[in-house]
Swiss-Prot record:
Source organism (scientific name): Bacillus subtilis (strain 168)
Gene of this entry: albB
Keyword tags: Antibiotic biosynthesis, Bacteriocin biosynthesis, Bacteriocin immunity, Cell membrane, Membrane, Transmembrane, Transmembrane helix
UniProt-annotated location(s): Cell membrane
Cellular compartments per GO CC: plasma membrane
Primary location group: membrane
Membrane topology: Multi-pass membrane protein
Disulfide bonds: none
Induction and repression of expression: Transcription is highly induced by oxygen limitation and is under dual and independent control of Spo0A-AbrB and ResDE.
Signal sequence interval, chain numbering: none
Protein function: Involved in the production of the bacteriocin subtilosin. Required for maximal production and for optimal immunity to subtilosin.
Transmembrane segments annotated in the record for this chain: 8-28, 30-50
GO biological process, one term: bacteriocin immunity
Protein name from the UniProt record: Antilisterial bacteriocin subtilosin biosynthesis protein AlbB
């Protein structure tokens, strides 16, 4: 898998987790909202680190 493909995959994953966080926020399940946001930030940071290489 090329670095560009991995970067796109990481961005898609972080986007999915952001959507999940919004869904849990609407259901007022704030613990899962925080967990999903943390995972999304983690994937986003990894994708950005891959960008800088």
């Amino acid at each position: 898998m090329s670095p560009a493909q991995r970067r796109i995959l990481l961005y898609i994953l972080s986007f999915i987790f952001v959507i999940g966080a919004v869904v849990y926020f609407v259901k007022s399940d704030y613990l899962f909202t925080l967990i999903f946001i943390a995972i999304a930030i983690l994937f986003g940071m990894r994708a950005r680190k891959a960008d800088s290489r």
